Design a protein with these regions (language model features):
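Active-site beta-strand/loop segments that form the cofactor-binding cradle
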Residues: 1-7, 18, 36
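Short loop/helix-cap segments at secondary-structure boundaries that form the rim of catalytic
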Residues: 3-7, 23-24, 43-44, 192
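Short acidic, glycine/serine/threonine-rich loops at helix termini
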Residues: 3-8, 75, 106-107, 133
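A glycine-rich beta-to-alpha transition motif near the start of alpha/beta enzyme domains, typified by
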Residues: 10-14
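N-terminal glycine-rich flavin-associated loop
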Residues: 15-62, 70, 74-106, 142-150
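ATP-binding N-lobe of GHMP and related small-molecule kinases
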Residues: 67
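C-terminal substrate-binding/cap subdomain adjacent to the FAD-binding core in PCMH-type
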Residues: 90-192
Length: 192
């Protein structure tokens, strides 16, 4: 992620060989995955069960990994509606600078055992520890999604999005570029 801030010097630690889904219980909405696993592989496995990563990790390359997505903390266009990547981290297994294999959090939605250290590593770019496994909360895919496109300038787009945000609309993402506002609606067919 050199494009994001100052490029770092040093050796790259490649974890792409440390891949695979460790545990996935669709009924519990939890997936534990090794961090070298590609985002595409995780999304495919979830889609087969009608589920998704709600934070929609951006894909900067076809072989982007879950470890990269969580380590960078990047979230996609659904962030405003669903939450950020760190909001979906239930637990992590990491290697610290001393080489210790540590686990924080767990595989349950409610974790009230003090500080949520598993979320600290989300967005830390590997500066706190090397993430080796992550347990993620996943969500059911919406029944239907559609994107509306409006021609409007910056000020009108900001005003429209702010107005719509205060209404009970199933908006899951917005994007404005080159005089066009894209509004994605997600949910039940009747609502969309």
């Amino acid at each position: 992620k050199d494009f994001y801030g100052v490029a770092l010097e040093g050796d790259v630690l490649d974890t792409t060989g440390h891949r695979g889904i460790v545990d996935y219980d669709p009924s519990e909405l939890v997936m534990t995955v090794r961090t070298g696993t590609s985002v595409a592989e995780v999304e495919t496995a979830l889609a087969e069960r009608g589920q998704m990563l709600a934070f929609e990790p951006p894909r900067f390359s076809p072989d982007g990994t879950i470890g990269g997505a969580i380590g960078s903390g990047f979230s996609g266009p659904r962030r405003a509606a669903a939450g950020s990547a760190r909001d979906f981290v239930l637990g992590v297994r990491v290697l610290d600078a001393a080489g210790r294999d540590l686990s924080f959090g767990g595989q349950v939605m409610k974790n009230v055992a003090g500080y949520d250290l598993s979320r600290f590593v989300a967005g830390s770019f590997g500066t706190l520890a090397l993430i080796t496994e992550v347990s993620l909360k996943v969500l059911p895919k919406p029944e239907v999604e559609t994107t509306l496109v409006f021609d409007m300038g910056d000020a009108a787009a900001i005003e429209a999005v702010n107005r719509w945000a205060g209404q009970p609309l199933p908006i899951s993402a917005t994007f404005h570029a080159e005089g066009r506002l894209f509004v994605r609606l997600s949910g039940a067919t009747a609502a969309v």
